[in-house]
Regions:
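Juxtamembrane intracellular "pre-TM" segments in multi-pass secondary transporters
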Residues: 1-10, 197-248, 442-456
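Helix-loop boundary and gating motifs at the non-cytosolic
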Residues: 2-56, 246-251, 256-273
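Intracellular juxtamembrane helix-capping segments at the cytosolic ends
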Residues: 34, 121-134, 357-372
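Helix-to-loop junctions at the C-terminal end of transmembrane segments
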Residues: 62-75, 165, 300-314, 402
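C-terminal ends and interior cores of transmembrane alpha-helices
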Residues: 86-102, 324-338
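Cytoplasmic helix-loop-helix junction between adjacent transmembrane helices
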Residues: 111-150
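Glycine-rich segments within core transmembrane alpha-helices of 12-TM secondary carriers
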Residues: 141-161, 384-394
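Symmetry-related core transmembrane helices of the 12-TM Major Facilitator Superfamily/SLC fold
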Residues: 173-191, 410-427
Length: 457
């Protein structure tokens, strides 16, 4: 059954945009600034590395399960989103209670594990609510808006955190108050989101959805009432063994394996360190500038990708464009490593283009592949886990190479690896645009035949 907006105060698409903006500010807990703060109060690099890796490792293990829970839950997904936002903010804010000295590791380690679990539910919940409310026909446009405003929120978060960290340096812990404020905003606006059709939110075909203006419309080719409730989810084996899902997971793994370490190396090449190993005050605006440049470019890339999709450009060329920006970025950083901070900072434009197109097309591809199977959020979680595994290995191996062989060797490794996802996706992923309805119709028709045969028997 479809549940429309609970209030006419905000149009549903605007409510989703405001929630996405707030969650973008919540981001990843401003990990890079947390690392700066912990170095400043006496933590060693090894302890910081463990602390900042725990969230990613936990999310890596939990995201697929979180997606499956979001698919199968009978509870209101809006409550899941509220709980996940609050817990993420509280756990990320635990750093405010760490005292000076290389101690109190348990508090941060435990909070990062909790943060990893809670944050794993945010993406699937928001995607599920979007699909449940707007259906397959308007999902792309509204999801593009969500992603755009998420990037804008990340820009706002980086600007606020960077400015307060620079002003309060070296006592920068109060910049983390932006995390709690962002969670509060998210909780307020989540209540204005429609619940939509819970079955449609997991990738089944529904009868009613909202258009972009918030008006209800009948979905073309909708199943009968009996068939809608008789829809069964595809087996786990069929989902995990699907070739397109496998190619997407492998492509994303290698993209993030090559990409994640690059920002760390870039930060090490820009600015400078104090004698104790902590970033200098002059490095803080550069670090914030790198984040802002990338996120602002991602916003532009998201708008461009949405417009191109509306004009009929397929998923494959847009996703490939995002992948190709990574080897260009690595090559430019190597070439400009001694050219000055301005040149190095400008390479973040390529990070923004790559991340923008990758982040936009990823949920489109998952919706295309899974619609009609009832496993949309499961595959969103599975792919996110593969991406996270690549990023975690990238940070660990990339920084080990930096320590042993230097920055150029680490970047050269990323450059070579960055061609693997391009080749994989170009050779093995078919174009999926326009196939979403076909998958859903096929699933409905097969169920209809089965239902008719049972009645005849």
């Amino acid at each position: 059954m479809f549940h429309g907006p609970t209030s006419s105060f905000l149009a549903p698409k605007i409510a989703f945009a405001l929630v996405s903006f707030s969650l973008g500010e919540l981001g990843d807990g401003l990990n890079i600034f947390q690392g700066i703060y912990l170095v400043g109060i006496g933590w060693n690099e090894g302890s910081i590395g463990i602390a900042l890796s725990l969230m990613g490792l936990t999310a890596l293990l939990v995201q697929t399960v979180a997606g499956d829970i979001v698919d199968k839950t009978t509870f209101d997904r809006r409550n899941f989103l509220i709980a996940a936002s609050i817990v993420t903010a509280l756990s990320a804010s635990a750093i405010l209670f760490v005292t000076e000295g290389n101690n109190e590791h348990a508090l941060i380690f435990i909070s990062k594990i909790i943060e990893g679990v809670a944050s794993s539910f945010i993406g699937p919940c928001l995607a599920a609510l979007t699909l449940a409310s707007f259906g397959p026909d308007h999902f792309d446009a509204v999801m593009a808006s969500n992603i755009l405003w998420g990037h804008v929120g990340s820009v706002a978060s980086a600007v606020l955190a960077g400015a307060s960290a620079y002003i309060l340096y070296p006592n920068i812990k109060y910049c983390f108050l932006v995390i709690g404020f962002s969670a509060l905003i998210a909780v307020i606006f989540v209540r204005f989101l429609p619940e939509g059709d819970p079955l449609m939110g997991r990738g089944f075909k529904g009868k009613v959805a909202l258009d972009e203006s918030g008006q209800e419309e009948i979905i073309e080719g909708a199943p009968t009432e009996d068939l809608q409730h008789e829809q069964e989810a595809a087996s786990y084996m069929s989902v995990f063994s699907d070739r397109n899902t496998f190619v997407l997971c492998l492509t994303g793994f290698f993209f993030h394996f090559a990409n994640a370490n690059v920002l760390l190396v870039l930060g090490e090449l820009m600015g400078g360190d104090n004698d104790d190993g902590s970033p200098s005050r002059s490095a803080i605006p550069l670090i914030a500038g790198a984040i802002v440049t990338a996120q602002a470019t991602m916003s532009i890339a998201t708008i461009a990708g949405d417009r191109l999709t509306e004009k009929g450009f397929g998923r494959k060329p847009l996703f490939l464009f995002g992948l190709i920006t990574l080897p260009l970025r690595c090559a430019l950083i190597i070439y400009w490593k001694d050219a000055g901070d301005a040149f190095l900072l400008s390479t973040q434009v390529f990070d923004g283009l790559g991340g923008g197109f990758f982040g936009l097309i990823h949920p489109y591809l998952v919706a295309d592949i899974t619609f009609g199977t009832g496993r949309f959020n499961l595959v969103m979680g599975l792919t996110a886990s593969c991406f996270g595994l690549g990023a975690t290995l990238s940070n660990y191996i990339g920084q080990t190479v930096v320590e042993k062989l230097g920055h150029v060797a680490s970047l050269s490794g990323s450059l070579v690896l960055s061609f693997i996802p391009v080749i994989l996706f170009a050779c093995f992923m078919p174009e999926t645009m326009g196939k979403r309805g076909n998958i859903a119709n096929k699933a409905t028709e097969e169920k209809g035949k089965s239902y008719t045969n049972m009645e005849m028997a």
